[in-house]
Swiss-Prot record:
Similarity comment: Belongs to the ABC-5 integral membrane protein family.
InterPro entries xrefs: ABC-5_transporter (IPR053046), ABC2_NosY/YtrC-like (IPR032688), ABC_transptr_acetoin_YtrC/YtrD (IPR023264)
Cellular component, GO annotation: plasma membrane
Protein name: Probable ABC transporter permease YtrC
GO MF annotation terms: ABC-type transporter activity
Lineage: Bacteria, Bacillati, Bacillota, Bacilli, Bacillales
Function: Part of the ABC transporter complex YtrBCDEF that plays a role in acetoin utilization during stationary phase and sporulation.
Annotated membrane topology: Multi-pass membrane protein
Length: 328
């Protein structure tokens, strides 16, 4: 599954990035506790103690909210940068099959992401015991949830890297996939509201039922987990990014194993994706710019002009992104 020779090669190739990722992920959680404690001590120095509370609340934005970033960087270094630099062909020429190569890259990154954050969780837990704050909110839920979400982000970018031929394409594809459910649902609904002059929530029994459905659908959008609003919901909500992680892993594994490497430098390794994706980009451009044009002046003329601009912009962006090969 994971070959030791490949593991050593990945370690030597990406040693600095791996060590920096480990350092950040290990320290992020305990540093959040230390920062809260120092803020409390600063309050005691400036004000009466009765106005100072030592409360650790993970629902307030803190450093671990960006723990997904190292996972993205690792995935780009493991696949996108290898393709952009032209070293992927050398790796594929080694006496290992593609399954071993992908599994080694994927599980090395996964191991770094999960184990580093578990160590950080343990250190933060020890600091809480030492500092003994008055209240601690969402510590376990947030710490474990961030591990799941950062692993999902890593899996998503790895899947994008297995489909694409350079680092830029990998990042753009990953970002597009992260917002794709929103684009598929929200843009058509918004345009229907403009065309028919009605609000979609009016067909629901109550505004509450509409907003409840919208909230539930947003849980299917990977990028929605970047902010920590999921903390106030059920802990079982984290099953969704966990399932997404496995789905992205399967997509990445199958794509890396089956797709040709001869198209390194191109946007997609599988050229049959070029045209459908270009059409999709143009459609999203038309719908998105159309809405922007309409809401700028609340006029149909603005809506039509926006759609025209969106079609042109979508065509050129997709053409120069997808059909122009990046030099490797």
């Amino acid at each position: 599954m994971v070959d030791r020779g490949l593991l050593y090669r990945e370690w030597k190739q990406n040693q600095v990035v791996i060590l920096l990722s480990i350092a950040f992920l290990v320290l992020a959680n305990p540093l959040s506790i230390v920062n809260t404690y120092l803020s409390y001590q600063g309050c005691l120095d400036r004000q009466d103690p009765q106005y100072c509370d030592f409360i650790v609340n993970y629902s307030i934005s803190n450093l671990i909210d960006i723990n997904w970033v190292p996972g993205v960087i690792l995935a780009v270094c493991f696949l996108g940068m290898e393709r952009s630099k032209g070293t992927m062909d050398f790796i594929l020429s080694l006496p290992y099959n593609r399954s071993q190569i992908f599994q080694t890259k994927f599980w090395l990154g996964g191991f770094v992401i999960v184990l580093s954050q578990l160590i950080g969780f343990l250190l933060a837990w020890l600091l809480i015991l030492v500092y003994n704050p008055e209240h601690v909110y969402f510590f376990e839920h947030s710490s474990i949830g961030v591990i799941v979400i950062s692993f999902m982000a890593f899996s998503l970018v790895m899947a994008a890297g297995a489909l694409t031929g350079n680092a830029f394409a990998q990042l753009l594809t990953a970002f597009s996939a992260a917002i794709l459910p929103y684009l598929i649902i929200a843009l058509p609904v918004g345009n229907l509201e403009v065309v028919f002059g009605a609000n979609i929530w009016e067909i629901f029994p109550s505004p509450e039922s509409y907003f409840s459905l919208a909230s539930n659908l947003s849980n299917l959008v990977p990028i929605s987990y970047v902010v920590n609003e999921w903390l106030i919901n059920s802990k079982y909500l984290l099953l969704i990014p966990a399932v997404m992680s496995m789905l992205f892993y399967l997509i990445g594994f199958i794509s890396f194993k089956k797709l040709p490497s001869e198209r390194n430098g191109h946007f997609f390794l599988w050229n049959r994706l070029d045209r459908p994706v270009q059409i999709l980009v143009m459609a999203f451009g038309i719908l998105g710019f159309g809405l922007f044009g309409y809401y700028t002046g609340h006029s149909i003329i603005g809506y039509i002009l926006g759609m025209i601009i969106g079609a042109v912009a979508g065509f050129f962006v997709s053409y120069f992104s997808i059909y122009k090969k990046t030099k490797v």
